[in-house]
Each structure stands twice: as C-alpha cells, then as structure tokens.
Amino acid sequence: WLAGIDGYDLVLLDLPLGMAPVIPCRRLLVVNADANCHVRLHRHPWAADERLLVTQFSSQRALQQGLLDLWLAGGLPLLNLHLHRDEAMAEAMAAKLPVGRYAPTSLVAHELAALATWCLAEGEAPR
C-alpha cells in the first residue's frame, strides 16, 4: 500500500483503539454524533494530544447539534471541524478513489482538505 501513496502529503490511518503508531502523528477519535457515542465518550481515556472529530454530521438534526453543545460544555477536546454526511464519500469509496479526486467540488472533499490543512498547520506532531 505504500507504493499507492506516492504524491500525497498526508495519510489517514484507521487504527484499533489502544494500538500506538510508531511514527509521529495526530490522534483523532472519529465519532458519529449519536447516543451510543455520547455514552462511550465519557468513558474514553483521552490522550493529551487527542482531538474529537465528528463525522456523518447533519446540522439539520437537532440531536446531533444538541450532542455537540453538550460535548463542548463538558470540555471534550472537540475539533472545530465536522465532516458532513455526503454521498460523494460513498461513491468515491465504491470507485476506489480518494474523494478529492472523485468529487473535488463536494462538501466532504472541502472538509477533508480543511482537516489536512489543520493537521499540517499544527507543525510536528508531539510524541
């Protein structure tokens, strides 16, 4: 898979909980804003540099907006960026292409570009 990342500046890896990467990295806990995640978040042992990234977000869903407000009020390390629910992501996965290449003007492609910018702008990842 390493041969397939030539030309990319950033790689996102989905690692199992508790598996520590051996290279410097940003730690993001990716969750849906739902009741299941809400219950589990308060039992999660947070690393000092870990941030919470909400995915499949829809600002029209009152429950999701309410949970975000609760998480902010509770002091959870919420990243000031959400990945909205966008059909372009599923279509890109089905086509086995990065969403930025498959649908570069989609909302989720712009949000992932913003996430990449945030990751790169933070400088060297602490480890």
Regions found by a protein language model. Name each.
Residues Q56-Q60, L68-A103, L112, W118:
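Beta-strand-loop-alpha "switch" segments that mediate conformational coupling across diverse proteins
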Residues L12-L15, L28-A33, E50-Q56:
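Conserved beta-strand segments of the P-loop GTPase G domain that flank and frequently precede/overlap
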Residues A48, V54, A125-R127:
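Acidic-aromatic/histidine active-site loop/patch
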Residues Y8, P24-R26, A47-A48, G75:
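Short, well-ordered alpha-helix to beta-strand connector turns
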Residues V22-P45, S58-L63:
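Conserved Switch II/interswitch segment of TRAFAC-class P-loop GTPases
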Residues L107:
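Aromatic (Trp/Tyr) and acidic
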Residues A114-P126:
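C-terminal alpha-helix
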Residues W1-P24:
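Switch II (G3) loop of P-loop NTPases
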